[in-house]
Swiss-Prot record:
Gene3D superfamilies: Bacterial extracellular solute-binding protein, family 7 (3.40.190.170). D-mannonate binds at residues 75, 93-95, 148-151, 171, 211. It comes from the Bacteria. This is Solute-binding protein RD1_1052. Pfam families: DctP.
């Protein structure tokens, strides 16, 4: 059951994601889960699903209040709140590298060849090392992971290999890793604010940009770009997390219930992601954009040295091994 309740002083709607199904069971605990996405985002819907499942599994004893749109605080503030015991849960990703350097592995360009490869890493030995470091150094416990849509390059001409970039002016985020990788690939990367991208494409200041399909769609880049080149250069994931201090208050049975509800939320979010990717592609194609397959191996090989030069010494051997897989 999802309830939407206006909370005074908050900028957005608070979703109460769980209620006791019977008056015979008294609510014992309410977990506050804040995140940055809006109510339509798959992460938010998965967070609500988590609350519903946890309520069912605990006979209504544990409720989850979901606060979207940064209404409980910005991402770093939420992590700090979890460490202080004022926030119970959030959805977060590579921001955790401020405490746990291995969290940078959540979004390394060309480290993951496919969604399946990323899943293997996130749920395997490397993923376990990342989670343990986050628990130890950030006092935040990852309990599920949500995949993000891969980033793709848009342009006014088809790009199938690094050679096709040939100095193409393209917008990138103001992140040294992105600038260096696209320079190594042969483009001319130009950091700029996202709010300036559409007009810059329209006026020819830049020739391309890179983002996930959902953002390409919502920003109406189909009006100023003709091609989506499926570079999929960044595959990444993000964690549903619970504060260690909150986790420690739970009985073993309730901890098991939390993990079971988190697994359900993870599966639910994956279904939403795949639906969204297919829907966004169909929409962009209907608006005239052409999807182009690229030589992924050639892009990865050209980007490797720049990626390795930009990651920390602690994770460099792992990144090198991922490139070799």
């Amino acid at each position: 059951m999802r309830l939407f309740t206006k909370i005074k002083g908050l900028a957005a709607v608070t979703c109460v994601a769980a209620l006791a199904s019977s008056a015979a069971f008294a609510q014992e605990m309410t977990l506050k889960l804040g995140h940055l996405a809006n109510e339509q985002n798959a992460w938010h819907l998965a967070a609500v699903k988590f609350g519903e499942e946890l309520s069912t599994l605990t006979d209504g004893r544990i409720a989850v209040e979901v606060f979207p749109n940064e209404s409980l605080g910005k991402e770093i503030d939420l992590i700090n709140g979890m460490q202080l015991g004022t926030v119970d849960m959030t959805i977060t990703g590579e921001s955790l590298q401020n405490w746990a350097p291995m969290a940078a592995l959540l979004a390394v360009p060309y480290a993951y060849k496919s969604l399946e490869h990323m899943d293997e890493v996130a749920s395997g030995e490397i993923g376990e090392q990342i989670k343990q470091q986050i628990i130890e150094k950030a006092q935040v416990r990852p309990i599920a992971f949500f995949a993000r849509g891969p980033r793709n390059l848009t342009s006014q001409r088809p790009i199938t290999s690094p050679a096709d970039l040939d100095g193409m002016k393209m917008r990138v985020p103001n992140v040294p890793l992105f600038v260096d990788v696209w320079s190594a690939l042969g483009a001319s990367p130009t950091p700029m604010a996202f709010s300036e991208v559409f007009t810059s494409l329209q006026n020819g200041v830049i020739d391309g940009q890179e983002n996930p399909l959902a953002l390409i769609r919502s920003a109406n880049f189909n009006e100023v770009q003709g091609y989506v080149n499926q570079t999929e250069h960044v595959r990444s994931w993000i964690y549903l997390t619970i504060a260690e201090s909150t986790w420690a208050k739970l009985s073993e049975d309730d901890q098991n219930a939390v993990m079971q509800a988190a697994a359900t939320a993870q599966e639910y979010e994956r279904g939403l992601l795949l639906e969204s990717l297919a829907e966004d592609r169909g929409y962009l194609e209907s608006k005239g954009m052409t999807f182009v397959e690229v030589d992924g191996a050639a892009f990865q090989a050209a980007a490797k040295d720049a990626v390795l030069a930009n990651v920390s010494e602690e994770i460099r051997p792992i990144v090198e091994s991922l490139f070799s897989e």
